[in-house]
Amino acid sequence: MKILITGGCGFVGSNLAIYLKKKIRNAQISSLDNLVRKGSRLNKIRLKNHNIRNYNFNIEKFDKFKKLPKFNLIIDCCAEPAIEASKRETNRVFNTNLIGTFNV
């Protein structure tokens, strides 16, 4: 089974990816994350240590999303959670949280 977790380098996504990797032995787990947050870059290393591949781009880029390999299951864990960012960068937060989720 091939599983993609969007927001896979975030707190929820990375822990879910590692959990699924341990529970479903023959699963191919992949992550998609834009790595904007510092914690995401650190979690990318954790995922690599568990043999979980990461695709690095923002899900609002639908043309790139369409070029990904086919997956049996996509779990959407991506979002821009920072309240302060939503005040400063309304368009970016809207595009990530709404347009990006629509693309998934």
Question: PLM ranges: what are they?
Answer:
Residues 1-104:
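N-terminal Rossmann-like NAD(P)+-binding domain of SDR-like oxidoreductases, especially those catalyzing
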